[in-house]
Swiss-Prot record:
The protein assumes different conformations with different physical properties depending whether maltose or trehalose is bound to the protein. It is found in: Cell membrane. Its main location: membrane. One of its GO terms (cellular component) is ATP-binding cassette (ABC) transporter complex, substrate-binding subunit-containing. This is Trehalose/maltose-binding protein MalE. The keyword Cell membrane applies. One of its GO terms (biological process) is maltodextrin transmembrane transport. It is a lipid-anchor. The complex is composed of two ATP-binding proteins (MalK), two transmembrane proteins (MalG and MalF) and a solute-binding protein (MalE). Gene3D superfamilies: Periplasmic binding protein-like II. Keywords: Cell membrane, Glycoprotein, Lipoprotein, Membrane, Signal, Sugar transport, Transport. PROSITE patterns: PROKAR_LIPOPROTEIN. It holds the Pfam family SBP_bac_1.
Length: 450
């Protein structure tokens, strides 16, 4: 997922045919209470806003900050530029928050970090601010708010932009081989991919039916989640307020076996799936005309339809397939904004959060950076819809996206899942053994945090 963040600005300079992103730091008294809503002239002070991303994203954030400072002449927002690497961004924030530093005051977080940040007490609850300002939360994706931003009945963050896994397909090849629509089930995908792969290899021996992320890293967990939940499985469940892992459920083992079969039995996915396939190798293979189907994030749409893309105008996008009797599942991704518990100017930080989440700024992210806004109402904006031909379909995917476990030990849990799922893909151990071992280690991990 790191590459995804780096390219997010280029992202949908087509995924919906558009482009995106933001920044802010310190000032008054540390308190969780909310004072009266400041006016444009009364608001004073400085805050630090930490954000990473591609160069064009950082430049856009500078523009957002300039507009905020123009609205509030007595305010200064310092942009603290983070690395493009997602994990490095997390570690930088963790170090600052563990040290109870007021720098940064406000920052973006990958949705997968929320469990750790909330459980560690690093985020300022936003409920009092929302209530005081009568702030309308209904404009956001409610599933995202409830599954990711709220915990224990309290609100800790707001979505800036949304991501979810998608199926890309070659419209021209489906038509060439007699298919009128993309696959709805995984078995349909296998059958279609095999037929297209067989035919295309007569002239292109490097052609593959289906490419996806199988290397040992975070996006492998995202892919695994999609197979698991589209088969009625789950990674875990909450019982009596405690998360209980369910990694070796029969549905999960069946899903992992299918992933293995894509490479070794059906042979529609390349052998290097589990050694090299991350977002960019997957995207490039599809974009160079060497694959019929691709699992990737929304950012790939714009790149597939760039002027120099060999597949420009030939690509369709659809929800990911599912197993019989179940529904499509897409892993929830994206970035959320929150306020540090240790900020010296929480009131100013909250005003900045509201500004970033305002209709005009969110629309700007969509129009200029190609981001998928956290606000639902922006998806109905005529200008955004005009620039985003697939926005309506993507919106439905986002509304039903599945989050990874929102638990404080998610980074360690992810490493466990990555390790054993990848070992199964490589043929080192069976899917059953892989998930049995993952289950045992996950149970031990949970005990450490009990």
């Amino acid at each position: 997922m790191n590459v995804k963040k780096v390219l997010l600005g280029l992202f949908l300079v087509g995924v919906l045919g558009i482009a995106v992103v933001a920044s802010g730091c310190i000032g008054g008294q540390q308190t969780s209470t909310v004072t009266s809503t400041p006016t444009e002239t009364s608001l004073q002070g400085k805050i630090v806003f930490a954000v990473g991303g591609a160069p064009n994203e950082i430049e856009y954030w500078k523009g957002v900050i300039a507009e905020f400072e123009k609205k509030y002449p007595g305010v200064t927002v310092e942009l603290k530029r983070q690395a493009t690497d997602t994990e490095q961004r997390r570690l930088d924030l963790v170090n600052a928050l563990r040290g109870k530093s007021s720098d940064p005051d406000v920052f973006l977080m990958d949705v997968a970090w929320l469990g750790q940040f909330i459980a560690s007490g690093w985020l300022e609850p936003l409920d009092d601010y929302v209530q005081k300002d009568n702030y309308d939360l209904s404009v956001f994706f409610q599933s995202v708010i409830n599954l990711a931003d709220k915990q224990g009945g309290k609100l800790y963050a707001l979505p800036v932009y949304i991501d979810a896994g998608l199926l890309y397909y070659r419209k021209d090849l489906l038509e060439k081989y007699g298919y009128s629509k993309p696959p709805e089930t995984w078995q349909e995908l296998v059958e279609m991919a095999q037929k297209i792969q067989s035919g295309e290899r007569e002239t292109n021996p490097n052609f593959w039916g289906f490419v996806w992320q199988g290397k040992q890293y975070e996006s492998l967990v995202c892919d695994f989640v999609e197979y698991v939940y589209s088969n009625g499985g789950s990674l875990g469940e909450f019982k009596d307020g405690k998360w209980v892992p369910t990694l070796n459920k029969p549905e999960n083992v069946e899903a992992l076996q299918f992933m293995v079969d894509l490479i070794h039995k059906y042979k529609i996915s390349p052998p290097n799936t589990y050694t090299e396939m991350t977002e960019e190798p997957v995207r490039l293979m599809f974009q160079q005309g060497n694959a019929a189907f691709e699992r990737n994030w929304p950012y790939a749409w714009g790149l597939h339809n760039a002027d120099d893309s060999p597949v420009k105008g030939k690509v369709g996008v659809a929800p990911l397939p599912h197993f019989p009797g179940h529904k499509s599942a897409a892993t929830l991704g994206g970035w959320h904004i929150g306020i540090s518990k240790y900020s010296d100017n929480k009131a100013l930080a909250w005003e900045f959060v509201k500004f970033v989440e305002s209709y005009s700024v969110q629309k700007g992210f969509a129009m200029n950076l190609g981001w998928n806004p956290g606000r639902v109402d922006v998806y109905d904006d005529p200008a955004v819809v005009s620039k985003s031909p697939h926005l309506k379909e993507l919106r439905a995917v986002f509304e039903n996206a599945v989050p990874r476990p929102i638990v404080p030990y998610y980074p360690q849990l992810s490493e466990i899942i990555q390790k054993y799922v990848n070992s199964a893909l490589a043929g080192k151990i069976s899917p059953q053994e892989a998930l049995d071992k993952a289950q045992k280690e996950a149970e031990e991990l949970v005990k450490q945090y009990s």
